Amino acid sequence: MKSRHKKLALIGGALAIIGIIAALVLNALNSNIALYISPTDVAEGKAPQGKAFRIGGLVKEGSLQRQADGVTIAFVVTDTAKDMTVHYKGILPDLFKEGKGVVAQGKMAADGTFTASEVLAKHDENYMPPEAAKAVGDAQAKSAGAEKPKASY
């Protein structure tokens, strides 16, 4: 082989290796992405089937139910427009309370409930997870817009 052909082969091999590494990294990142979906979006059928996503809002007052085993919990997440039942098996964060902000990551179950693999609670009195705050604000805006008749000129 000539020197020129060796250089071209080396450059081609390096580009192929870089391409394979880039494809593997993008595949790993794509599989770890969890979209945020509000309870209203889930009710409208916008939740991905068979893929993990995050759902957020407020824990509905009086909805927390603990099973006899002590680690299985069911609660309702609301964005003030729609509600979604969440099932979680594990220890809840210390700051988890009814009426407070929460974001849960998991998948939709066959029965239409959300099975969470992770539950995140708010940090302090003034904090609500950004996704939950946006969902609550959007839901309130939708319900306010639906209640008010639109002006015609």
UniProtKB/Swiss-Prot annotation:
One of its GO terms (cellular component) is plasma membrane. It is a single-pass type II membrane protein. Heme binds at H123, Y127. Keywords: Cell inner membrane, Cell membrane, Cytochrome c-type biogenesis, Heme, Iron, Membrane, Metal-binding, Signal-anchor, Transmembrane, Transmembrane helix. Residues 130-153 are annotated as: Disordered. It is found in: Cell inner membrane. The chain crosses the membrane at residues 8-28. Residues 29-153 are periplasmic. GO terms for biological process: cytochrome complex assembly. It comes from the Bacteria. InterPro entries: CcmE, CcmE-like_sf, NA-bd_OB-fold. Gene3D superfamilies: Nucleic acid-binding proteins. PANTHER family: CYTOCHROME C-TYPE BIOGENESIS PROTEIN CCME HOMOLOG, MITOCHONDRIAL. Belongs to the CcmE/CycJ family. This is Cytochrome c-type biogenesis protein CcmE. It comes from Dechloromonas aromatica (strain RCB).
